[in-house]
């Protein structure tokens, strides 16, 4: 079923015209945290907007975010109302627990809303907005901070091809961007949203292993990070199954297959699969709580 739904999302993507109006977009951010900052920089790099064409709402004591937007030429305000009235596109970029507090500020908003708030369903957002408001739910991950994000999005019932193309063009500026059905957002969050944390643990463990075997910690971290980067690039760019790439490294009776046997014996695969499953369940719990509220 999931494969069918993913294929359905990919089919929708194929139908999107590639001639979006390329005029610069005025963009408002409700919430000016690190992800909003990363997106703003990506939009500027891609020529989709300019610093002076973006406005973000921040808490008065969030000096770091205020300064970050100032550095790219953007203004910040301490309330949401000016941001809601400001641009062509509004990005809801606050923590999920804050969403119920800011939605009343959007009660008259009728333009395109892109929500990156984890676990907040499209139905909850659409219910709080005027009928007909186009809403798209987006799930980026933190590597978007360095332009290597993995993002998916799902359309609300009033978001058409034009709105989907705007979302895809914006989020493609900070990495990969794909369309999926909304019921796949939770497993995507567990895999790609939480996945960097799992990989950081792997990098740390690889480095610790190197240190245990005599490497100095600085070079151990560099080698571990570069190894993960290189392996990921191989999977992405060669279109080769990761199992085949693994086999290519593992010589008969060699050190690699010996290490693989140790990992298999200690349940590495099962632990990672279980982590994605557990994180998906937690995402669904958050979504369920949001719907009740």
Where are these regions (language model features)?
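Small-residue helix-packing motif on alpha-helices
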Residues: 54, 83, 216-223, 245, ...
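Rossmann-like NAD(P)(H) cofactor-binding subdomain of soluble oxidoreductases
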Residues: 39, 55, 62, 72, ...
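NAD(P)-dependent Rossmann-like dehydrogenase/reductase catalytic/cofactor-binding core
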Residues: 19-23, 225-293
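Alpha-helix N-cap/start motif
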Residues: 50-51, 122, 217, 242
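NAD(P)+-binding Rossmann beta1-loop-alpha1 motif at the extreme N-terminus of oxidoreductases
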Residues: 18-78, 148-149, 211-212
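N-terminal amphipathic/basic-hydrophobic helices that include classical n-h-c signal peptides
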Residues: 1-23
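A short glycine-threonine-serine/GTX helix/turn-capping micro-motif
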Residues: 188-197, 218, 246
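Internal alpha-helical scaffold of NAD(P)-dependent oxidoreductase catalytic cores
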Residues: 124-134, 150-187, 200-237, 282
